[in-house]
């Protein structure tokens, strides 16, 4: 059986130097079953990612993975930008998007709520500081179940 997390981590380590060399920030790598296996590589760069950027990285990664033979089953390779409502998984994602509006779903309630939306104020060690309308909330990263950038509600 395939170890999806291990494959994603290995691919991430292999792809990062190529991504960096092309001027991209490697945002995430996922390997998931979706009507067959999908290797999803998500990149970003200042000014945004173009289709040509995705195509260039896809060609290079495809050639590399053919040689490295990390994935033993058939799969689809998908290279894309993270999109407007990108998921925030790594600590650096929060630092990178400081000042942006985000929606967080917590593993357990804080102040009697399990979902918060506000501005990413800062990162302090292992804690996210989220600026809400009426207060600032400190949320330990290990309490966050899922987080993503969101579009402000008017």
Swiss-Prot record:
CDD domains: YlxS_C (cd01734)
GO-annotated biological processes: ribosomal small subunit assembly; translation
Cellular component per GO, a single term: cytosol
Endoplasmic reticulum in keyword set: no
Pfam families referenced in this protein's UniProt entry, alphabetically: DUF150_C (PF17384), RimP_N (PF02576)
Record localization: Cytoplasm
Stretches that traverse the bilayer: none
Entry annotated with the keyword Cytoplasm: yes
Disulfide-bond pairs as recorded: none
Keywords per UniProt: Cytoplasm, Ribosome biogenesis
Function in brief: Required for maturation of 30S ribosomal subunits.
HAMAP family found in the cross-reference section: RimP
Similarity remark: Belongs to the RimP family.
Protein's recorded name: Ribosome maturation factor RimP
Organism of this sequence: Hydrogenobaculum sp. (strain Y04AAS1)
């Amino acid at each position: 059986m395939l170890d999806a997390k291990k494959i994603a981590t290995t691919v991430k380590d292999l792809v990062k130097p190529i991504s960096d060399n092309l001027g991209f920030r490697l945002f995430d790598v996922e390997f998931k079953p979706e009507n067959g296996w999908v290797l999803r590589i998500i990149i970003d760069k200042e000014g945004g990612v173009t289709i040509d950027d995705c195509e260039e990285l896809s060609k290079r990664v495809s050639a590399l993975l053919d040689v490295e033979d990390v994935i033993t089953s058939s799969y689809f390779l998908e290279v894309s930008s993270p999109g407007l409502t990108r998921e925030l998984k790594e600590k650096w994602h929060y630092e990178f998007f400081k000042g942006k509006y985000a929606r967080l779903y917590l593993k357990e309630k804080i102040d009697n709520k399990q979902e918060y939306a506000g501005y990413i104020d800062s990162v302090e060690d292992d804690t996210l500081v989220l600026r809400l309308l009426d207060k600032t909330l400190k949320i330990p990263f290990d309490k966050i179940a899922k987080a993503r950038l969101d579009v402000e509600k008017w």
